[in-house]
C-alpha cells in the first residue's frame, strides 16, 4: 500500500471511528452513574489520530486534532458567520449575518467538537431565494415558516417542486442541485443539519464534496412518487422523503425510553449518514438517560422543559433549559436526559448518525434504567412549581 493509501485509511479512522466517539474501553451499560473518578490526562494517540480522552470510568474516545474539517473551518471564518458552542437558545431569533455563499443571511453551526455532522440557519427574505447548491453530503432541513418551495433537479432531468410550510421537514436528495424560494410576505428561517464534516474528513477534498458529477439515481431519479412516499414499516419506523408537519405527525409508543413517551424514526432520502427521529413526552414525564457514540443535534418543536447532561461517574450535571426553537447538543458519549415538567406535551427532533456508527461495527448507545434519587427529586420540585403532577411509572 502506498503512503498516500495509508494516510487515506488513517483519515477514515479519524473521520468515521475516532471522531464518532469510538468506544475504546466499552463495557456493559451501567444501571446508575458510578462514583466520581479522577480524570486521566489526554494522551497522544498518533499524528493523525488525535488524543485519547477519558469520558468516564469505563469509556474513552479519541478527540481528533487538526482534521480536514478543522482546517476548512479555520479558512471559512473569513467569509462565513460561525457559531461554536453547545446551545442556541432560539434558532428562530439568533442573530444572523450576510452569508455570500448562500445568498442570504445565515449562521454556520459548529457544535461541541463534532466531526460527523454540522448545521446552519438561513433566513430567506420575503419572495426571495437562496443561491443554488449541490453537494456530496446528506442534508435534512426543518422550516420554521412558510409558505415556500424548493426546486430539485438532476442533470438532464425535469425539475421537481417541493412545497413546504412552517414545521415541514425535507431531506435533500444526495448530490442533486436545489434552491429554496420563499413564497410569502415574511422572512422564513430554516435549520439544516448535514454530514459535511464526515464527508470532508473522509475524502480530504472540498472539490470532491462540491464539484462531483456523480448521480445517486438509486436514491432519487425524478420518480413521480418520491415526494408522496409515506410507508409505515412497523413500530417507530416510517420511510418518507417529506414530512409536511413534524409537530402533527402521528407517533408510536416508545416505552423503552419511558412510560407514556412516543417516537418515530424517519428514513428519509435513502440517507445512510444522518438519521431523523422525533420524540414526545407528555407533561409530568421524563425520558431515561442515555448516551451515544455519534454527534446529535436536538431541536425543540414544542413545550418547555430542561435536559441534563454529564460524563459517566460525574456528580455535577449540566442543565439546559429549553423551549420551542432551542437547539442543543450533548458532548460525545456524555449521558443526557430530557425532562418535561410542564402540563403540555413537549416534542423534539433529533438528527444524528446511528446507521453510520452501527455499520462501522461500533456500539451506538447505552441507557441508564434507574435514575438516581436527586434527578427524581429535582424533577418533582419543577413539576410542583408549575402546578402539575409527576406521572410515575408503574
Segments predicted by a language model, with ranges:
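Bacterial N-terminal signal peptides that target proteins for export
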Residues: 2-13
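A short hydrophobic beta-strand segment most commonly corresponding to one strand
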Residues: 140-142, 171, 185-204, 298-299, ...
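Short acidic-glycine-tyrosine-enriched beta hairpin
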Residues: 154-173, 312-331
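Conserved short histidine dyad/triad with adjacent acidic residue
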Residues: 101-107, 118-135, 277-292, 311
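Histidine-centered metal-chelating micro-motifs
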Residues: 129-131, 149-150, 168-180, 286-287, ...
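A short, N-terminal "cap"/entry segment at the start of jelly-roll beta-barrel domains
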Residues: 28, 33-115, 205-273, 277, ...
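Bacterial N-terminal signal peptides
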Residues: 11-22
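Glycine- and acidic-residue-biased ligand/ion/polar-headgroup-sensing regions
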Residues: 125-126, 135-155, 283, 292-312
Amino acid at each position: 500500500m502506498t503512503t498516500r493509501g495509508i494516510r487515506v485509511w488513517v483519515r477514515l479512522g479519524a473521520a468515521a471511528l475516532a471522531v464518532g466517539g469510538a468506544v475504546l474501553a466499552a463495557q456493559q451499560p451501567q444501571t446508575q452513574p458510578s462514583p466520581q473518578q479522577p480524570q486521566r490526562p489526554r494522551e497522544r494517540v498518533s499524528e493523525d489520530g488525535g488524543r485519547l480522552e477519558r469520558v468516564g470510568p469505563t469509556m474513552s474516545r479519541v478527540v481528533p486534532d487538526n482534521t480536514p474539517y478543522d482546517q476548512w473551518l479555520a479558512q471559512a471564518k473569513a467569509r462565513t458567520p460561525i457559531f461554536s458552542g453547545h446551545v442556541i437558545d432560539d434558532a428562530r431569533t439568533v442573530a444572523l449575518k450576510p452569508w455570500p455563499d448562500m445568498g442570504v443571511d445565515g449562521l454556520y453551526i459548529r457544535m461541541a467538537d463534532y466531526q460527523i455532522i454540522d448545521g446552519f440557519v438561513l433566513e430567506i427574505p420575503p419572495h426571495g431565494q437562496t443561491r443554488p447548491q449541490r453537494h456530496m453530503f446528506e442534508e435534512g432541513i426543518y422550516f420554521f415558516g412558510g409558505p415556500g418551495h424548493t426546486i430539485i433537479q438532476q442533470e438532464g432531468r425535469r425539475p421537481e417542486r417541493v412545497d413546504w410550510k412552517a414545521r415541514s421537514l425535507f431531506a435533500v436528495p444526495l448530490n442533486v442541485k436545489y434552491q429554496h424560494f420563499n413564497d410569502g410576505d415574511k422572512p422564513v428561517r430554516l435549520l439544516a443539519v448535514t454530514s459535511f464534516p464526515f464527508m470532508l474528513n473522509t475524502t480530504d477534498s472540498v472539490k470532491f464534496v462540491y464539484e462531483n458529477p456523480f448521480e445517486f439515481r438509486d436514491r432519487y431519479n425524478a420518480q413521480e412518487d418520491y415526494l408522496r412516499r409515506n410507508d409505515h414499516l412497523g413500530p417507530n419506523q416510517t420511510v418518507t422523503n417529506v414530512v409536511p408537519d413534524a409537530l402533527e405527525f402521528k407517533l408510536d409508543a416508545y416505552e423503552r425510553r419511558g412510560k407514556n413517551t412516543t417516537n418515530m424514526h424517519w428514513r428519509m432520502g435513502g440517507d445512510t449518514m444522518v438519521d431523523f427521529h422525533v420524540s414526545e413526552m407528555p407533561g409530568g414525564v421524563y425520558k431515561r438517560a442515555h448516551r451515544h457514540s455519534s454527534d446529535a443535534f436536538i431541536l425543540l418543536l414544542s413545550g418547555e422543559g430542561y435536559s441534563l447532561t454529564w460524563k459517566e461517574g460525574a456528580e455535577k450535571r449540566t442543565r439546559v433549559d429549553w423551549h420551542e426553537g432551542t437547539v442543543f447538543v450533548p458532548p460525545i458519549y456524555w449521558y443526557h436526559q430530557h425532562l418535561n415538567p410542564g402540563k403540555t406535551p413537549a416534542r423534539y427532533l433529533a438528527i444524528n448518525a446511528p446507521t453510520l456508527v452501527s455499520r462501522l461495527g461500533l456500539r451506538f448507545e447505552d441507557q441508564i434504567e434507574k435514575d438516581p434519587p436527586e434527578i427524581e427529586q429535582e424533577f418533582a420540585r419543577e413539576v410542583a412549581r408549575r402546578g402539575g403532577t409527576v406521572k410515575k411509572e408503574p
